[in-house]
């Protein structure tokens, strides 16, 4: 095995092991014991190899972290998988809850319930099982309630580099036309999931 092939194999292994979290070129350079520039060159070689060959994965970059992802041309097959109960779409309650968590994280269930005006336990369970939110700590004070926040998968699923890419929230009363647009947004969002 050539020296370059050995380094490529190490980088590919690191990409696999880090999964959805991905890994930065700086971290790869430190672990493989090469320069960051060489890592970038090797990532380009690996990306080209994956594009040329009949492989089910590709190299993706998000927020200066690299990871292995599935190829877009296999999306129909993955949609079939997503239609299973574990990977199914989200209810309106779950979408509302997800939006609240995304914008107000870290946040407790009681705080979510207060914003929504109804209980959110089932919606939270659904979002946790779909890996869109996770426990991110405990609130201080009596009871030490669980705090929820979004996951890296949430960012990836919605094509965001970071939470700063979320649209700005504007406190306004929606007229009927705007409400219809909001409903269409939630319908599209649910269809995408």
Curated annotation (Swiss-Prot):
Its main location: cytoplasm. The keyword Cell cycle applies. InterPro entries: ScpB_csome_segregation, WH-like_DNA-bd_sf, WH_DNA-bd_sf. The keyword Cytoplasm applies. It is found in: Cytoplasm. It comes from the Bacteria. GO terms for biological process: cell division; chromosome separation; DNA replication. Keywords: Cell cycle, Cell division, Chromosome partition, Cytoplasm. One of its GO terms (cellular component) is cytoplasm. It holds the Pfam family SMC_ScpB. Belongs to the ScpB family. Participates in chromosomal partition during cell division. May act via the formation of a condensin-like complex containing Smc and ScpA that pull DNA away from mid-cell into both cell halves. HAMAP family: ScpB (MF_01804). Homodimer. Homodimerization may be required to stabilize the binding of ScpA to the Smc head domains. Component of a cohesin-like complex composed of ScpA, ScpB and the Smc homodimer, in which ScpA and ScpB bind to the head domain of Smc. The presence of the three proteins is required for the association of the complex with DNA. This is Segregation and condensation protein B. It comes from Shouchella clausii (strain KSM-K16). The lineage of its organism: Bacteria, Bacillati, Bacillota, Bacilli, Bacillales. The gene is scpB.
